[in-house]
């Protein structure tokens, strides 16, 4: 929960519903972009028994949790429901929801549901093994996390659900539907299904037809910031919002996060440091990576696309290290009243740049067409406890995350011609002052850190405000509301050192992938169908 002693003179407020992988939040903002209050609840996406890789999205429980968050946010803000001028929803991407022909939700899965591994392989073989390339050239997506293999899985194993299905949306659209009763998708989130055209920002039914799937389940497409409907009497009773409150189209979490960071113009670059690290570059026109290493998504800004290269489990790796090895530091941080990561950063700051040559092996650079990683490990450890200890390993992890990030950005620059002149660093990772400086040193460009680091909800609130005329436009409002906390200038003395570390890491990582290929080690993560 977060609360600020600030009010909007008019008494107008906006609500964002943010459905993340691990939790759902209802966040209230004033019109100046200040967060007033937030209600939050964790949720779990449980596997279906005897369905390997499944990650079911519990529609009933998760709506109840959302309603709980809305009521909590209103209570903490000490606001009547009538103060909320509009609401919009955003969510993790790739997660889909199916509805029957009467509009009732009947099935859903979360973002990294991997049950359809066999179906991915099956679809890849279509058109003389050229179907995935056709999908990518149209949508900027591969089959790895797209909706088509999941629909094919339903046709194979749950034909009852497949036959009943009348409409498909994303999870953000499901929240909007539960509030308003209306069904539509926005391009930024629906683009991750692999069934939306990057240029027209509309569905491509022929892709489903080529896969032998039904193309009659595609809902209307409405741009982010468009009025969808109004809170129904039933929804008002369940969640505590006022009946008749406008419900506005939201979108995908990363794209709305970029809006909240003011990353709205071609050439701008952001690194969003959460569980995954997303390296995002706004492209001047829809183009694709000829090597198919990078995904291309519609931005929430009409006509704009984003190249997105993902580092896998970066934040999760840091949490694992903290919880597995730093019990002492957690207790000390608690006694000092500081965050454990801050304490670990203070320790790591005393370690020389380069971390004595220790090489973490966790996420690879994104290879979207053949997406898998080596087994987690540390390479080149020393038995000297003065040089090889928790502080060294923690610094090595931060440096490696920055190296992978720089490689991902270089990969985007290679096919797009767009090279970052500065980077906006946001998300939980941006709280680390040492990490922010390391990112600047490794990338060689200034790194700007915003005041609001979890910007997705703010971007979603901006969409809500645009939808009811409280703001003029998405891009202008995003630029106006973002405020900067600090900027980090690259230390040129570290450039050659980190370049050498990157070259060494790339060579070692290639060898480590070979161990996975031989079946000697287990991949950190492997995309369905590999």
From Swiss-Prot:
The organism's place on the tree of life at top rank: Bacteria
Membrane-spanning ranges: none
Keywords: Cytoplasm, Kinase, Transferase
The reaction(s) this protein catalyses: (S)-4,5-dihydroxypentane-2,3-dione + ATP = (2S)-2-hydroxy-3,4-dioxopentyl phosphate + ADP + H(+)
One Gene Ontology molecular-function label: autoinducer-2 kinase activity
SUPFAM superfamilies: Actin-like ATPase domain
GO cellular component annotations of the record: cytoplasm
Cellular localisation: Cytoplasm
Enzyme Commission code: 2.7.1.189
Record has DNA repair as a keyword: no
GO annotation terms (biological process): carbohydrate metabolic process; quorum sensing
Annotated InterPro entries: AI-2_kinase, ATPase_NBD, Carb_kinase_FGGY, FGGY_C, FGGY_Carb_Kinase, FGGY_N
Summary of the function given for this chain in its UniProt record: Catalyzes the phosphorylation of autoinducer-2 (AI-2) to phospho-AI-2, which subsequently inactivates the transcriptional regulator LsrR and leads to the transcription of the lsr operon. Phosphorylates the ring-open form of (S)-4,5-dihydroxypentane-2,3-dione (DPD), which is the precursor to all AI-2 signaling molecules, at the C5 position.
Record family assignment: Belongs to the FGGY kinase family.
UniProt-recorded name of the protein: Autoinducer-2 kinase
Organism: Yersinia pestis bv. Antiqua (strain Angola)
